[in-house]
From Swiss-Prot:
Protein name stated in the entry: HTH-type transcriptional regulator LrpB
Keyword annotations of the record: DNA-binding, Repressor, Transcription, Transcription regulation
Organism superkingdom: Bacteria
One Gene Ontology term of the molecular function aspect: sequence-specific DNA binding
PANTHER family reported in the protein's UniProt record: HTH-TYPE TRANSCRIPTIONAL REGULATOR LRPB, LEUCINE-RESPONSIVE REGULATORY PROTEIN
InterPro entries: AsnC-type_HTH_dom, Dimeric_a/b-barrel, Tscrpt_reg_AsnC-like, Tscrpt_reg_AsnC/Lrp_C, WH-like_DNA-bd_sf, WH_DNA-bd_sf
DNA-binding region: 22-41
Pfam family, one: AsnC_trans_reg
Any one of the GO BP annotations: response to amino acid
Gene from which this protein is expressed: lrpB
Amino acid sequence: MQIDSIDFQILQLLNKNARIQWKEIGEKIHMTGQAVGNRIKKMEDNGIIKAYSIVVDELKMGFSFTAFVFFFMNAYMHDDLLKFIATRNEISEAHRVSGDACYLLKVTVHSQEVLNHLLNDLLKYGNYQLYLSIKEVKKHYNTSLMSDE
């Protein structure tokens, strides 16, 4: 599906505030709320809009430990590892990477004990290097793709 300039404007507004009412979007781009809703539904159906979400403050939620784990596979057990990753809520992000490591995992946990348990469970798939975050200095949600600048 190709998006046109109107769809792009709708996406920009949703990107700034996913809770915005269709009617309000329509007022800003000179369409009816129903027409906006139809366009949003079409973008959802075509996978342009995948989900709506919230951003929470991990520290305020009690996730006081953030770690980055470079993971090195022992063998070709990638499918098993990917299944394991999918079941673990402590792993907030997982990326297949180039270089010496196979994967980069971002882990957020309440305690060192939970982190240690996860790391012990990972050992059946390979080895890791652990980097603890001391302080988050920047967190950016990439909205530049939606910028008209």
